[in-house]
């Protein structure tokens, strides 16, 4: 177990932080990082070799979205483990003829009611359900049964928990120092500074990490609309226009384009999916013609209309 003990010259702040790049973390509510080096041997070569045809945009997608903490319980007080899910979940998806499963965020997070959308351990599968190699086995089993794996990924904001990324070295290292751009009023969380190269590199390396080390077939990027607009959930006087006088977050847009160009050029057969709830143009058009570069976009209107109909 370890943490970084930081004594900053900024206001003489002393703090202890979890490692932002830790591969494994203590089970919440504990917050230390854990030295970990798994030696998992993948058995999904057939899927990976043929993924480019199975996971392409001209193929049908039937996606089952799942929150691992509430899908099933081993008993009333115990989560099912990644290893349990490798049996029960795979069998269920096959019986229901789903082509893909989308995991709501499985990166480490401190607060259960957030459903995983407020991350502190971007490089670590949450220890709630087991070890990193156990999650790899779950992905492996899904691939061996021709089921693609999409991960919810949250580059839009992060929580203010003391051990997390916020005010990391006594300064706004990851978040934008301007609260009009660096604080999310809805979620009471911090917003990444997309204009800082080191922050962009952190996030893009994290996307690459999950696609590479965990064989993810796609990333569903959360809360894209909140990234695109400077006035998202802000009243007049609470935001500052960009250099052109409008409400688009040019730094975030540039980051999203760079992200999509990077992952599509680095990994064959993957897809990125935008959860974008407005009418922003060209979300799933190529960057080369001015688009954001996503492969797909959630049809948010259909989702809300369908849920309203059933409820």
What are these regions (language model features)?
Residues 10-12, 181, 269:
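Detector for glycine-centered tight turns/loop "hinges" at secondary-structure junctions
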Residues 215-217, 232-311:
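Conserved alpha/beta catalytic core and glycan-binding cleft of carbohydrate-active enzymes
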């Amino acid at each position: 177990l370890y943490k970084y003990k930081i004594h900053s010259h900024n206001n003489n702040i002393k703090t202890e932080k979890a490692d932002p790049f830790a591969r494994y973390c203590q089970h919440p509510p504990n917050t230390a990082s854990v030295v970990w080096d798994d030696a998992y041997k993948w058995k999904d070569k057939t899927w990976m070799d043929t993924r480019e045809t199975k996971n392409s945009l001209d193929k049908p997608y039937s996606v089952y979205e799942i929150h691992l903490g509430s899908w099933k319980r081993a008993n009333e007080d115990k989560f099912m483990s990644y290893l349990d899910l490798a049996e029960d979940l795979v069998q269920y998806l096959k019986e229901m003829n789903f082509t893909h499963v989308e995991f709501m965020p499985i990166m480490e997070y401190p607060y259960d009611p957030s459903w995983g959308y407020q991350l502190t351990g971007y490089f670590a599968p949450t220890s709630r359900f087991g070890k990193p190699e156990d999650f790899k086995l779950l992905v492996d089993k899904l691939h061996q049964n021709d089921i693609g794996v999409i991960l919810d990924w949250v580059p839009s904001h992060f929580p203010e928990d003391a051990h997390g990324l916020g005010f990391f070295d006594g300064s706004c290292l990851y978040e934008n120092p301007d609260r009009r751009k660096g604080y999310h009023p809805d979620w009471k969380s911090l917003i990444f500074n997309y204009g800082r190269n080191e922050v962009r590199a952190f996030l893009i390396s994290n996307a690459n990490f999950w696609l590479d080390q965990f064989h993810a077939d796609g990333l569903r990027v959360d809360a894209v609309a909140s990234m695109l607009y400077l006035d998202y959930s802000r009243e007049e006087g609470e935001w500052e226009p960009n250099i052109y006088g409008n409400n688009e977050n040019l730094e975030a847009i540039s980051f999203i384009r760079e992200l999509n160009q990077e992952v599509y050029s680095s990994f064959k057969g993957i897809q990125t999916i935008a959860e974008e709830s407005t009418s922003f143009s060209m979300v799933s058009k190529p960057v080369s013609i001015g688009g954001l570069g996503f492969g797909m976009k959630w049809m948010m209107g259909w989702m809300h209309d369908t849920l309203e109909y059933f409820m």
